[in-house]
Amino acid sequence: MVRTPCCKEEGIKKGAWTPEEDQKLIAYLHLHGEGGWRTLPEKAGLKRCGKSCRLRWANYLRPDIKRGEFSPEEDDTIIKLHALKGNKWAAIATSLAGRTDNEIKNYWNTNLKKRLKQKGIDAITHKPINSTGQTGFEPKVNKPVYSSGSARLLNRVASKYAVELNRDLLTGIISGNSTVAEDSQNSGDVDSPTSTLLNKMAATSVLINTTTTYSGFSDNCSFTDEFNEFFNNEEISDIYTTVDNFGFMEELKSILSYGDASAGVIENSPEVNVADAMEFIDSWNEDDNMVGVFV
């Protein structure tokens, strides 16, 4: 439904009110009281819209309107009520005697809102403004990629170079539990799980188990060449750059290069992914009798 206009547009005066118009409106309301705003202009001898007469009286001419600066108590009341009711100025005005909704709205927009912002408080939610702004969203924190990057790299290395790999050791690599976790707690060192794994790998000849050259390996391609080619592989390089602790990579390289330079590789060893690592573990040796120390 469309609301009918309160008065006809023809002959209606707009703009600022004159003192004479104010006096006519005041005199009429003193005699007849408030109400009947649609017919009031004609009865009071005003060429104004009924709505304009009502707002002029409510916001400027009403005798109980409180003038002057807002007190600190009024400021606190407005802020508290705004936090509860939002921009419902008429509802807020009922709690501040003598203050009009229009005056409160203007005072909020020109003073209180800016004051709250200076104190680091959001004028809409009335909560502290986050360091990222007023959106309330926190920046995404990049999760450490050390564990996943290391696991993927070790799987790649194991699948290419290993002949025998201890089942418990690989389980520790993938899940980070059992002995590895206990060693980490005992040592108190952030990198102790990695160091423990590397020591155990070195002692049990995990990564380079034999110096025998396999038939699928060409005579003119040495272990060193394969080693360098492996670490220069684009995918391995990507993993390398995502690992936080580069000391881990250096230790791993030193283990891979440890021993006879003629150490061979398995030509068609399957690639191991973290997702299906447990299936890959089952095919490996379960012997874990040697204890090594990697300095």
Swiss-Prot record:
Concerning what turns on (or off) its expression, the entry says: Up-regulated by herbivory.
**Keyword ATP-binding included in the entry's annotation:** no
Q: Which residues bind DNA?
A: 37-61, 89-112
What InterPro entries does the entry give?
Homeodomain-like_sf, Myb_dom, Myb_TF_plants, SANT/Myb
Position of the signal peptide: none
Coiled coil location: none
A Gene Ontology cellular-component term: nucleus
Pfam families linked to this entry: Myb_DNA-binding
Q: Name one GO molecular function term.
A: transcription cis-regulatory region binding
Record bears the keyword Nucleus: yes
Q: Which UniProt keywords apply?
A: Activator, DNA-binding, Nucleus, Repeat, Transcription, Transcription regulation
Tissue localization of expression is: Expressed in trichomes.
Note the CDD domains from the entry: SANT
Q: Tell me, in one coarse class, where this protein mainly resides.
A: nucleus
Compartments in which it is found: Nucleus
Q: Which residues form the HTH myb-type domain?
A: 9-61, 62-116
Describe the inactivation phenotype.
Answer: No visible phenotype. Reduced indolic glucosinolate levels in adult leaves and loss of responses to brassinosteroids.
Q: Name one GO biological process term.
A: L-tryptophan biosynthetic process
Its job: Transcription factor involved in tryptophan gene activation and in indole-3-acetic acid (IAA) and indolic glucosinolates (IG) biosynthesis. Acts as a direct transcriptional activator of both Trp synthesis genes and Trp secondary metabolism genes.
Q: How does it assemble?
A: Can form complexes with MYC2, MYC3 or MYC4.
Q: What is this protein called?
A: Transcription factor MYB34
| Organism whose genome encodes this protein | Arabidopsis thaliana (Mouse-ear cress)
According to the entry, what is the taxonomic lineage of the organism?
Answer: Eukaryota, Viridiplantae, Streptophyta, Embryophyta, Tracheophyta
